[in-house]
Amino acid sequence: MLSMFMYNNIVDYVDDIDNGIVQDIEDEASNNVDHDYVYPLPENMVYRFDKSTNILDYLSTERDHVMMAVRYYMSKQRLDDLYRQLPTKTRSYIDIINIYCDKVSNDYNRDMNIIHDMASTESFTVYDINNEVNTMLMDNKGLGVRLATISFITELGRRCMNPVETIKMFTLLSHTICDDCFVDYITDISTPRDNATTNSSTREYLKLMGIAVIMFATYKTLKYMIG
């Protein structure tokens, strides 16, 4: 588990983000002549996933490129520092998730692209996405569906136009995905055992990934067809 010091730092960081959003909303409202306009709460803001959105479209001057480079460097240093502070067990779980989620993305790249394209045509709130994921996980207890969901949500996060809201989405969905089933699977995989047994079990789990992708696509297609 994270140390209390690290936990407090993370909580403070999230609180700073929340306070900044609230302050931005209040500042914007005070400068707006239409004081009856109600600004949406951050957690209810809509995610718009646009496949054509490219960060390069917003970088037009040398200053823009330099500022982006600085922001990237600072973000990377913060993440690298957090990784170094994590306990060995946490880092081992990160390695496991990296390996298997990369496998999902590679093996089911075409199917997942179809779903990404479908998601790009619609708008969601963070709760819409979380409810759909929660419903899917309740109906399927396999490891594959959870790994496929992580890959899918990660890809959606890359397409989200609002970085702060992306952080909020990842935070909420990490709680949803990390249910008892997922914790049991990951801890089981990380436990040293006979390689043949491990590989056999993993193959069975990974078979569910294709089913997970089809389930998600079918669910979303029916939802939008029915309205």
UniProtKB/Swiss-Prot annotation:
Pfam families found in the cross-reference section: M11L
Keyword Nucleotide-binding: no
Principal subcellular localisation of the protein: host cell
InterPro entries found in the cross-reference section: Bcl-2-like_sf, Orthopox_F1, Poxvirus_F1/C10
Compartments where located: Host mitochondrion outer membrane; Host cytoplasm
Induction: Expressed in the early phase of the viral replicative cycle.
Keyword Ribonucleoprotein in annotation: no
Keywords: Host cytoplasm, Host membrane, Host mitochondrion, Host mitochondrion outer membrane, Host-virus interaction, Inhibition of host apoptosis by viral BCL2-like protein, Membrane, Modulation of host cell apoptosis by virus
GO biological process, one term: regulation of apoptotic process
Any one GO cellular component localisation term in the record: membrane
Record's function text: Plays a role in evading host innate immune response by inhibiting host inflammasome activation. Interacts with and inhibits NLR-mediated interleukin-1 beta/IL1B production in infected cells. At the host mitochondria outer membrane, interacts with the BH3 domain of host BAK and prevents BAK from binding active BAX. In turn, host apoptosis is inhibited.
Family: Belongs to the orthopoxvirus OPG045 family.
Subunit structure: Homodimer. Interacts with host pro-apoptotic protein BCL2L11 (via BH3 domain). Interacts with host NLRP1. Interacts with host BAK.
UniProt name for this protein: Apoptosis regulator OPG045
Species name: Rabbitpox virus (strain Utrecht) (RPV)
Gene: OPG045
